[in-house]
Amino acid sequence: MKLITNKQGLVGAITVPGDKSMSHRSIMFGAIAEGKTVIRHFLRADDCLGTIKAFKALGVKIEETEEEIIVHGTGFDGLKQADGPLDIGNSGTTIRLMMGILAGRDFDTVILGDESIAKRPMNRVMLPLQQMGAKMHGKDGSEFAPITINGKQSLKRMEYHMPVASAQVKSAIIFAALQAEGETIIHEKEKTRDHTEHMIRQFGGEIEMDGLTIRVKGGQTFTGQEMTVPGDVSSAAFFIVAGLITPGSEIELTHVGLNPTRTGIFDVVEQMGGSLVVKDSSRSTGKLAGTVVVKTSDLKGTEIGGDIIPRLIDEIPVIALLATQAEGTTIIKDAAELKVKETNRIDAVATELNKMGADITPTEDGLIIRGKTPLHAANVTSYGDHRIGMMLQIAALLVEEGDVELERAEAVSVSYPTFFEDIRSLLK
Protein backbone atom coordinates (compact mmCIF):
# COMPACT_ATOMS: atom_id res chain seq x y z
CA MET A 1 0.00 0.00 0.00
CA LYS A 2 1.24 3.50 -0.87
CA LEU A 3 1.28 5.66 2.27
CA ILE A 4 0.33 9.35 2.54
CA THR A 5 3.47 11.52 2.25
CA ASN A 6 4.68 15.14 2.21
CA LYS A 7 1.63 16.79 3.72
CA GLN A 8 2.28 20.16 5.32
CA GLY A 9 0.41 19.86 8.54
CA LEU A 10 -2.54 18.05 10.05
CA VAL A 11 -5.32 20.28 11.36
CA GLY A 12 -8.70 19.46 12.86
CA ALA A 13 -10.49 17.28 15.40
CA ILE A 14 -11.17 13.55 15.50
CA THR A 15 -12.56 11.04 17.98
CA VAL A 16 -10.35 7.96 18.10
CA PRO A 17 -11.98 4.51 18.33
CA GLY A 18 -12.95 2.96 21.65
CA ASP A 19 -10.25 1.65 23.95
CA LYS A 20 -9.16 -1.84 22.89
CA SER A 21 -8.38 -3.14 26.38
CA MET A 22 -11.71 -1.91 27.74
CA SER A 23 -13.69 -3.15 24.73
CA HIS A 24 -12.36 -6.69 25.27
CA ARG A 25 -13.12 -6.58 28.97
CA SER A 26 -16.58 -5.06 28.54
CA ILE A 27 -17.62 -8.14 26.54
CA MET A 28 -16.00 -10.49 29.07
CA PHE A 29 -17.65 -8.89 32.10
CA GLY A 30 -20.94 -8.58 30.23
CA ALA A 31 -20.82 -12.31 29.54
CA ILE A 32 -20.01 -13.41 33.11
CA ALA A 33 -22.52 -10.95 34.62
CA GLU A 34 -26.21 -11.65 35.17
CA GLY A 35 -28.56 -9.66 32.95
CA LYS A 36 -28.04 -7.26 30.08
CA THR A 37 -24.93 -5.13 29.39
CA VAL A 38 -25.11 -2.31 26.85
CA ILE A 39 -21.79 -1.06 25.44
CA ARG A 40 -21.38 2.13 23.40
CA HIS A 41 -18.30 3.32 21.47
CA PHE A 42 -17.09 -0.29 21.33
CA LEU A 43 -13.98 -0.84 19.21
CA ARG A 44 -15.23 -2.75 16.15
CA ALA A 45 -11.80 -3.97 15.13
CA ASP A 46 -10.58 -7.49 14.38
CA ASP A 47 -9.25 -8.26 17.87
CA CYS A 48 -12.35 -7.18 19.77
CA LEU A 49 -14.73 -8.73 17.26
CA GLY A 50 -12.80 -11.95 17.90
CA THR A 51 -13.73 -11.72 21.58
CA ILE A 52 -17.41 -11.36 20.63
CA LYS A 53 -17.10 -14.39 18.35
CA ALA A 54 -15.52 -16.44 21.15
CA PHE A 55 -18.30 -15.72 23.64
CA LYS A 56 -20.99 -16.40 21.07
CA ALA A 57 -19.34 -19.81 20.60
CA LEU A 58 -19.60 -20.29 24.39
CA GLY A 59 -23.35 -19.78 24.27
CA VAL A 60 -23.63 -16.07 25.10
CA LYS A 61 -26.23 -14.10 23.14
CA ILE A 62 -24.64 -10.88 21.81
CA GLU A 63 -26.48 -8.39 19.61
CA GLU A 64 -24.65 -5.87 17.44
CA THR A 65 -26.43 -2.68 16.32
CA GLU A 66 -24.92 0.39 14.68
CA GLU A 67 -24.68 2.23 18.01
CA GLU A 68 -24.41 -0.50 20.63
CA ILE A 69 -23.26 -3.96 21.56
CA ILE A 70 -25.78 -5.75 23.80
CA VAL A 71 -24.52 -8.71 25.83
CA HIS A 72 -27.04 -11.00 27.51
CA GLY A 73 -24.94 -12.29 30.39
CA THR A 74 -25.07 -15.89 31.55
CA GLY A 75 -22.83 -15.68 34.61
CA PHE A 76 -19.76 -17.91 34.82
CA ASP A 77 -21.96 -20.99 35.24
CA GLY A 78 -24.00 -20.27 32.11
CA LEU A 79 -21.04 -20.56 29.74
CA LYS A 80 -21.33 -23.66 27.56
CA GLN A 81 -18.77 -25.82 25.77
CA ALA A 82 -18.05 -24.61 22.24
CA ASP A 83 -18.67 -26.94 19.31
CA GLY A 84 -15.01 -26.70 18.30
CA PRO A 85 -11.80 -24.77 19.05
CA LEU A 86 -12.07 -21.06 19.84
CA ASP A 87 -10.13 -19.20 17.12
CA ILE A 88 -9.15 -15.79 18.54
CA GLY A 89 -7.16 -14.63 15.51
CA ASN A 90 -4.40 -12.17 16.44
CA SER A 91 -5.59 -11.20 19.92
CA GLY A 92 -3.15 -11.86 22.75
CA THR A 93 -5.56 -10.21 25.19
CA THR A 94 -8.37 -12.60 24.25
CA ILE A 95 -6.36 -15.81 24.54
CA ARG A 96 -4.70 -14.92 27.84
CA LEU A 97 -7.79 -13.58 29.60
CA MET A 98 -9.94 -16.44 28.28
CA MET A 99 -7.47 -18.88 29.84
CA GLY A 100 -8.36 -17.39 33.22
CA ILE A 101 -12.10 -17.30 32.52
CA LEU A 102 -12.23 -20.91 31.27
CA ALA A 103 -9.81 -22.40 33.82
CA GLY A 104 -12.64 -22.98 36.29
CA ARG A 105 -15.39 -24.14 33.96
CA ASP A 106 -16.77 -27.68 33.85
CA PHE A 107 -15.92 -28.35 30.21
CA ASP A 108 -12.81 -28.68 28.03
CA THR A 109 -11.76 -25.94 25.61
CA VAL A 110 -9.10 -25.54 22.92
CA ILE A 111 -8.03 -21.98 22.09
CA LEU A 112 -5.97 -21.22 19.00
CA GLY A 113 -5.00 -18.19 16.94
CA ASP A 114 -3.01 -17.02 13.96
CA GLU A 115 0.69 -17.48 13.20
CA SER A 116 1.66 -14.58 15.49
CA ILE A 117 -0.31 -15.96 18.45
CA ALA A 118 1.36 -19.36 17.98
CA LYS A 119 4.74 -17.71 18.71
CA ARG A 120 3.74 -15.80 21.85
CA PRO A 121 4.73 -17.16 25.29
CA MET A 122 1.87 -18.55 27.39
CA ASN A 123 3.72 -20.06 30.38
CA ARG A 124 3.49 -16.67 32.07
CA VAL A 125 -0.28 -17.31 32.24
CA MET A 126 -0.37 -21.11 32.44
CA LEU A 127 2.04 -21.50 35.37
CA PRO A 128 0.15 -19.32 37.88
CA LEU A 129 -3.19 -20.78 36.77
CA GLN A 130 -1.78 -24.28 37.23
CA GLN A 131 -0.72 -23.28 40.76
CA MET A 132 -4.40 -22.53 41.39
CA GLY A 133 -5.37 -26.03 40.26
CA ALA A 134 -6.12 -25.42 36.59
CA LYS A 135 -5.16 -28.08 34.04
CA MET A 136 -3.95 -26.72 30.71
CA HIS A 137 -1.14 -27.23 28.25
CA GLY A 138 0.16 -25.92 24.95
CA LYS A 139 0.85 -27.68 21.68
CA ASP A 140 2.77 -30.95 22.21
CA GLY A 141 3.30 -30.02 25.86
CA SER A 142 4.91 -26.67 25.00
CA GLU A 143 3.84 -23.19 26.14
CA PHE A 144 2.56 -22.21 22.70
CA ALA A 145 -0.96 -22.19 21.23
CA PRO A 146 -3.16 -24.07 20.61
CA ILE A 147 -3.88 -24.13 24.36
CA THR A 148 -5.96 -27.02 25.71
CA ILE A 149 -7.87 -26.29 28.94
CA ASN A 150 -9.22 -29.31 30.83
CA GLY A 151 -12.33 -28.34 32.77
CA LYS A 152 -13.94 -29.70 35.95
CA GLN A 153 -11.05 -28.50 38.11
CA SER A 154 -11.54 -26.94 41.54
CA LEU A 155 -9.54 -23.71 41.69
CA LYS A 156 -7.96 -22.69 44.98
CA ARG A 157 -6.73 -19.36 46.27
CA MET A 158 -3.06 -18.42 46.07
CA GLU A 159 -0.64 -15.62 46.84
CA TYR A 160 1.38 -14.79 43.75
CA HIS A 161 4.34 -12.50 43.15
CA MET A 162 4.31 -11.59 39.47
CA PRO A 163 7.73 -12.05 37.80
CA VAL A 164 6.80 -9.77 34.88
CA ALA A 165 4.77 -6.56 34.67
CA SER A 166 1.82 -7.71 32.57
CA ALA A 167 -1.80 -6.57 32.77
CA GLN A 168 -2.83 -9.60 30.70
CA VAL A 169 -1.28 -12.08 33.14
CA LYS A 170 -2.69 -10.19 36.12
CA SER A 171 -6.17 -10.14 34.56
CA ALA A 172 -6.10 -13.86 33.76
CA ILE A 173 -5.27 -14.61 37.40
CA ILE A 174 -8.05 -12.26 38.58
CA PHE A 175 -10.63 -13.99 36.37
CA ALA A 176 -9.53 -17.37 37.75
CA ALA A 177 -9.55 -16.00 41.31
CA LEU A 178 -13.18 -14.95 40.90
CA GLN A 179 -13.97 -18.68 40.48
CA ALA A 180 -11.63 -19.96 43.22
CA GLU A 181 -12.22 -20.75 46.88
CA GLY A 182 -11.01 -18.06 49.27
CA GLU A 183 -9.08 -14.85 48.68
CA THR A 184 -6.28 -14.61 46.11
CA ILE A 185 -3.50 -12.08 46.64
CA ILE A 186 -1.46 -10.75 43.71
CA HIS A 187 1.71 -8.71 44.14
CA GLU A 188 2.61 -6.75 41.00
CA LYS A 189 6.22 -6.16 40.03
CA GLU A 190 5.26 -2.72 38.67
CA LYS A 191 1.91 -1.00 38.34
CA THR A 192 0.17 -2.03 35.10
CA ARG A 193 -3.09 -0.95 33.47
CA ASP A 194 -5.96 -1.58 35.86
CA HIS A 195 -9.06 -1.78 33.65
CA THR A 196 -9.97 -5.25 34.96
CA GLU A 197 -9.91 -4.09 38.58
CA HIS A 198 -12.07 -1.05 37.86
CA MET A 199 -14.56 -3.10 35.84
CA ILE A 200 -15.01 -5.55 38.71
CA ARG A 201 -16.29 -2.63 40.78
CA GLN A 202 -18.30 -1.19 37.89
CA PHE A 203 -20.15 -4.51 37.50
CA GLY A 204 -20.90 -4.69 41.24
CA GLY A 205 -18.01 -6.82 42.48
CA GLU A 206 -15.36 -6.26 45.14
CA ILE A 207 -11.59 -6.01 44.83
CA GLU A 208 -8.96 -4.42 47.07
CA MET A 209 -6.07 -2.47 45.56
CA ASP A 210 -3.29 -1.19 47.81
CA GLY A 211 -0.21 -0.02 45.94
CA LEU A 212 1.12 -3.07 44.10
CA THR A 213 -1.03 -5.56 46.05
CA ILE A 214 -4.43 -6.78 44.84
CA ARG A 215 -6.87 -8.94 46.84
CA VAL A 216 -9.81 -10.63 45.15
CA LYS A 217 -12.35 -13.05 46.64
CA GLY A 218 -13.86 -15.99 44.82
CA GLY A 219 -17.53 -16.75 44.36
CA GLN A 220 -18.57 -13.24 43.33
CA THR A 221 -21.46 -12.49 40.99
CA PHE A 222 -21.83 -9.49 38.70
CA THR A 223 -24.72 -7.43 37.34
CA GLY A 224 -25.03 -6.18 33.76
CA GLN A 225 -24.29 -2.49 33.17
CA GLU A 226 -24.57 0.30 30.62
CA MET A 227 -21.20 1.77 29.67
CA THR A 228 -19.49 4.00 27.14
CA VAL A 229 -15.93 3.02 26.23
CA PRO A 230 -13.57 6.05 26.10
CA GLY A 231 -11.23 6.58 23.16
CA ASP A 232 -8.07 4.48 23.13
CA VAL A 233 -5.02 6.47 24.24
CA SER A 234 -2.83 3.97 22.35
CA SER A 235 -4.64 4.89 19.12
CA ALA A 236 -4.56 8.59 20.03
CA ALA A 237 -0.77 8.30 20.44
CA PHE A 238 -0.24 8.14 16.67
CA PHE A 239 -2.04 11.44 16.19
CA ILE A 240 -0.30 12.98 19.20
CA VAL A 241 3.06 12.24 17.57
CA ALA A 242 1.83 13.31 14.11
CA GLY A 243 0.72 16.65 15.54
CA LEU A 244 4.06 17.21 17.28
CA ILE A 245 6.37 16.38 14.35
CA THR A 246 4.47 17.42 11.21
CA PRO A 247 5.06 21.13 10.38
CA GLY A 248 2.10 23.46 10.86
CA SER A 249 -0.09 21.00 12.76
CA GLU A 250 -2.72 21.35 15.47
CA ILE A 251 -4.86 18.31 16.29
CA GLU A 252 -7.69 17.96 18.80
CA LEU A 253 -8.50 14.43 19.99
CA THR A 254 -11.84 14.17 21.78
CA HIS A 255 -13.08 11.70 24.43
CA VAL A 256 -9.64 10.13 24.99
CA GLY A 257 -9.33 7.78 27.97
CA LEU A 258 -7.12 9.29 30.69
CA ASN A 259 -6.56 6.35 33.02
CA PRO A 260 -3.22 7.20 34.73
CA THR A 261 -1.90 3.67 34.11
CA ARG A 262 -2.10 4.40 30.36
CA THR A 263 -0.89 8.00 29.98
CA GLY A 264 2.88 7.59 30.20
CA ILE A 265 3.22 9.08 26.71
CA PHE A 266 1.91 12.41 28.06
CA ASP A 267 4.81 12.48 30.55
CA VAL A 268 7.33 11.70 27.80
CA VAL A 269 5.97 14.46 25.54
CA GLU A 270 6.35 16.91 28.44
CA GLN A 271 9.93 15.72 29.09
CA MET A 272 10.75 16.28 25.42
CA GLY A 273 9.30 19.79 25.36
CA GLY A 274 6.20 19.02 23.30
CA SER A 275 2.99 21.05 23.37
CA LEU A 276 0.24 18.79 24.76
CA VAL A 277 -2.78 20.11 26.67
CA VAL A 278 -5.60 18.10 28.26
CA LYS A 279 -8.94 19.89 28.62
CA ASP A 280 -12.63 19.12 29.27
CA SER A 281 -11.77 16.04 31.32
CA SER A 282 -14.78 14.26 32.81
CA ARG A 283 -15.78 10.94 34.32
CA SER A 284 -17.36 8.63 31.75
CA THR A 285 -18.96 5.63 33.47
CA GLY A 286 -16.23 5.62 36.09
CA LYS A 287 -13.42 6.27 33.63
CA LEU A 288 -11.66 9.58 33.16
CA ALA A 289 -11.81 10.94 29.60
CA GLY A 290 -10.98 14.29 28.03
CA THR A 291 -9.80 16.23 24.99
CA VAL A 292 -6.10 16.22 24.08
CA VAL A 293 -4.69 19.07 21.97
CA VAL A 294 -1.22 18.89 20.37
CA LYS A 295 0.75 21.33 18.21
CA THR A 296 3.96 21.18 16.19
CA SER A 297 6.85 21.48 18.65
CA ASP A 298 10.63 21.66 18.93
CA LEU A 299 11.67 18.53 20.80
CA LYS A 300 14.72 17.36 22.75
CA GLY A 301 15.94 13.84 23.50
CA THR A 302 15.24 12.14 26.82
CA GLU A 303 15.66 8.88 28.75
CA ILE A 304 12.69 6.56 29.21
CA GLY A 305 12.78 3.58 31.57
CA GLY A 306 11.73 2.11 34.91
CA ASP A 307 8.17 2.16 36.19
CA ILE A 308 6.88 4.37 33.37
CA ILE A 309 7.37 1.53 30.84
CA PRO A 310 4.15 -0.39 31.67
CA ARG A 311 2.27 2.93 31.29
CA LEU A 312 3.41 3.31 27.66
CA ILE A 313 4.54 -0.13 26.49
CA ASP A 314 2.25 -0.12 23.44
CA GLU A 315 3.23 3.43 22.50
CA ILE A 316 6.99 2.80 22.32
CA PRO A 317 7.09 2.29 18.51
CA VAL A 318 5.58 5.72 17.88
CA ILE A 319 7.58 7.30 20.73
CA ALA A 320 10.70 6.03 18.93
CA LEU A 321 9.52 7.87 15.81
CA LEU A 322 8.97 10.99 17.92
CA ALA A 323 12.56 10.69 19.16
CA THR A 324 13.93 10.66 15.59
CA GLN A 325 12.61 14.23 15.29
CA ALA A 326 14.08 15.43 18.60
CA GLU A 327 17.47 17.09 19.01
CA GLY A 328 19.93 14.83 20.80
CA THR A 329 19.82 11.21 21.92
CA THR A 330 16.84 9.37 23.37
CA ILE A 331 17.38 6.13 25.30
CA ILE A 332 14.52 3.69 25.85
CA LYS A 333 15.32 0.87 28.30
CA ASP A 334 13.59 -1.75 30.52
CA ALA A 335 11.28 -2.60 27.60
CA ALA A 336 12.29 -6.20 26.79
CA GLU A 337 8.56 -7.05 26.82
CA LEU A 338 8.46 -5.54 23.30
CA LYS A 339 10.20 -8.66 22.00
CA VAL A 340 7.12 -10.82 22.65
CA LYS A 341 4.42 -8.60 21.18
CA GLU A 342 2.84 -9.27 17.75
CA THR A 343 6.39 -9.10 16.45
CA ASN A 344 9.75 -8.22 18.02
CA ARG A 345 8.97 -4.52 18.16
CA ILE A 346 12.49 -3.53 19.18
CA ASP A 347 13.97 -4.99 16.01
CA ALA A 348 11.03 -3.96 13.82
CA VAL A 349 11.17 -0.29 14.86
CA ALA A 350 14.92 -0.05 14.36
CA THR A 351 14.95 -1.91 11.03
CA GLU A 352 12.06 -0.08 9.38
CA LEU A 353 12.83 3.46 10.57
CA ASN A 354 16.52 3.02 9.71
CA LYS A 355 15.42 2.15 6.15
CA MET A 356 13.87 5.62 6.07
CA GLY A 357 17.01 7.36 7.31
CA ALA A 358 16.70 7.21 11.09
CA ASP A 359 19.71 6.50 13.32
CA ILE A 360 18.49 3.85 15.77
CA THR A 361 20.41 1.11 17.58
CA PRO A 362 18.41 -1.75 19.10
CA THR A 363 19.50 -3.02 22.53
CA GLU A 364 18.54 -6.04 24.64
CA ASP A 365 15.75 -4.11 26.33
CA GLY A 366 15.12 -1.04 24.21
CA LEU A 367 16.42 1.45 21.68
CA ILE A 368 18.99 4.23 21.33
CA ILE A 369 17.70 6.91 18.96
CA ARG A 370 19.92 9.72 17.71
CA GLY A 371 18.08 12.76 16.36
CA LYS A 372 17.19 14.84 14.62
CA THR A 373 17.14 12.96 11.29
CA PRO A 374 15.21 13.67 8.08
CA LEU A 375 13.22 10.69 6.79
CA HIS A 376 13.12 9.59 3.16
CA ALA A 377 11.12 7.23 0.94
CA ALA A 378 11.56 3.46 1.34
CA ASN A 379 9.73 0.16 1.06
CA VAL A 380 8.76 -0.90 4.59
CA THR A 381 6.71 -3.62 6.29
CA SER A 382 4.44 -3.84 9.31
CA TYR A 383 5.46 -7.48 9.98
CA GLY A 384 1.71 -8.01 10.45
CA ASP A 385 1.84 -5.77 13.56
CA HIS A 386 -0.82 -3.04 13.67
CA ARG A 387 1.23 -0.64 15.79
CA ILE A 388 4.27 -0.89 13.51
CA GLY A 389 2.05 -0.26 10.48
CA MET A 390 0.45 2.87 11.97
CA MET A 391 3.80 4.22 13.18
CA LEU A 392 5.21 3.91 9.66
CA GLN A 393 2.29 5.89 8.22
CA ILE A 394 3.03 8.74 10.64
CA ALA A 395 6.71 8.55 9.62
CA ALA A 396 5.71 8.74 5.95
CA LEU A 397 4.07 12.14 6.57
CA LEU A 398 7.60 13.57 6.88
CA VAL A 399 8.81 12.24 3.51
CA GLU A 400 9.13 15.05 0.95
CA GLU A 401 10.01 13.10 -2.21
CA GLY A 402 9.16 9.65 -3.49
CA ASP A 403 6.75 7.00 -2.26
CA VAL A 404 6.63 4.96 0.91
CA GLU A 405 5.23 1.49 0.20
CA LEU A 406 3.93 -0.45 3.21
CA GLU A 407 3.67 -4.24 3.05
CA ARG A 408 0.97 -5.91 5.17
CA ALA A 409 -0.93 -2.66 5.72
CA GLU A 410 -4.07 -4.67 6.49
CA ALA A 411 -2.69 -5.34 9.99
CA VAL A 412 -3.87 -1.86 11.02
CA SER A 413 -7.47 -3.13 11.12
CA VAL A 414 -6.61 -5.15 14.24
CA SER A 415 -7.11 -2.03 16.38
CA TYR A 416 -8.01 0.93 14.12
CA PRO A 417 -10.00 0.12 10.96
CA THR A 418 -10.56 3.82 10.08
CA PHE A 419 -6.95 4.92 10.71
CA PHE A 420 -6.08 5.95 7.15
CA GLU A 421 -9.43 7.73 6.71
CA ASP A 422 -8.82 9.72 9.89
CA ILE A 423 -5.36 10.76 8.64
CA ARG A 424 -6.89 12.02 5.38
CA SER A 425 -9.59 13.94 7.26
CA LEU A 426 -6.89 16.06 8.94
CA LEU A 427 -4.93 16.96 5.80
CA LYS A 428 -4.80 20.67 5.04
From Swiss-Prot:
Pathway per the UniProt entry: Metabolic intermediate biosynthesis; chorismate biosynthesis; chorismate from D-erythrose 4-phosphate and phosphoenolpyruvate: step 6/7
Cellular compartment(s): Cytoplasm
GO biological process, any: amino acid biosynthetic process
Binding site for phosphoenolpyruvate: K20, G92, R120, Q168, R345, R387
Main location: cytoplasm
Pfam families xrefs: EPSP_synthase
EC numbers on record: 2.5.1.19
One GO CC term, this protein: cytoplasm
Active-site positions on this chain: D314 (proton acceptor)
Binding residues annotated for 3-phosphoshikimate, in chain numbering: K20, S21, R25, S166, Q168, D314, K341
Reaction(s) catalysed by this chain's protein: 3-phosphoshikimate + phosphoenolpyruvate = 5-O-(1-carboxyvinyl)-3-phosphoshikimate + phosphate
GO molecular function: 3-phosphoshikimate 1-carboxyvinyltransferase activity
Keywords: Amino-acid biosynthesis, Aromatic amino acid biosynthesis, Cytoplasm, Transferase
InterPro entries xrefs: Enolpyruvate_Tfrase_dom, Enolpyruvate_Tfrase_sf, EPSP_synthase, EPSP_synthase_CS, RNA3'P_cycl/enolpyr_Trfase_a/b
HAMAP family (alphabetical): EPSP_synth (MF_00210)
Family: Belongs to the EPSP synthase family.
Free-text function comment from the UniProt entry: Catalyzes the transfer of the enolpyruvyl moiety of phosphoenolpyruvate (PEP) to the 5-hydroxyl of shikimate-3-phosphate (S3P) to produce enolpyruvyl shikimate-3-phosphate and inorganic phosphate.
Stored PANTHER family: AROM/DEHYDROQUINATE SYNTHASE, PENTAFUNCTIONAL AROM POLYPEPTIDE
Assembly and interaction partners: Monomer.
Official protein name in the record: 3-phosphoshikimate 1-carboxyvinyltransferase
Designated gene of the protein: aroA
